[in-house]
């Protein structure tokens, strides 16, 4: 698991690398720098990775990154139109499972095509994009702001997500938003998922 520096092209958002076989994944777009591109090539090695986008908020300068790497991109179908020159580009509607067993779920609210990515045990990780945002050390919660697409849908998506996660799984949470509020932490325990942020 690898966390890239905050991406100023996506409001300081976070991009994660998960080294799986046979298909490692890059979740959301890191900063377009030579350091990022070099790290990605080294992490990939001889494998053929895929880029997973959790929402339009995580696109950053994806087209330029994808041009340099040539990796296929997977995005929820509602936001494919935002990436007209990205090839190869694949879409999904409600659910998707990758070659390495990652499970994607459409969770609209923050944006029309928001989704989450669940890595089952033994990884046991939930990449929640902007659906859950850091608001304090060890705490993630939904945040309503000017860019929120549809707040009631976001709350419905959170309820759907709780039911979708296997009952015997309590995955660690990874946000695609800026992580400053976590005060140096990266991963948040499942118990840190709050349905309402106290400062909202």
Locate predicted features.
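Short, compositionally biased "basic patch" segments
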Residues: 1-19
């Amino acid at each position: 698991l690898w966390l890239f520096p905050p991406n100023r092209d996506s409001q300081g958002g976070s991009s994660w690398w998960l080294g799986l076989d046979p298909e490692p994944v890059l979740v959301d777009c890191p900063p377009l720098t030579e350091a990022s591109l070099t790290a990605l090539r080294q992490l990939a090695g001889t494998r053929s990775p895929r880029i997973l986008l959790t929402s339009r908020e995580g696109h950053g300068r994806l087209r330029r990154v994808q041009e340099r790497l040539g990796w296929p991109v997977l995005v929820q179908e509602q936001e494919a139109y935002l990436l007209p020159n990205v090839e190869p580009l694949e879409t999904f509607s409600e659910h998707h499972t990758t070659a390495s067993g990652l499970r994607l779920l459409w969770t609209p609210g923050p944006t029309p095509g928001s989704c989450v990515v669940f890595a089952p045990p033994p990884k046991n990780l939930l990449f929640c994009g902007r659906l859950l945002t850091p608001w304090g050390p060890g705490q993630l919660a939904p945040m309503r702001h000017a860019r929120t697409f549809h707040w009631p849908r976001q709350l419905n998506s959170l309820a759907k997500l709780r039911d979708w996660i296997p009952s015997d799984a309590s995955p660690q949470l990874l946000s695609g938003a800026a992580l400053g509020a976590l005060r140096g932490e990266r991963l948040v325990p499942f118990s840190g998922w709050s349905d309402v942020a106290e400062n909202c």
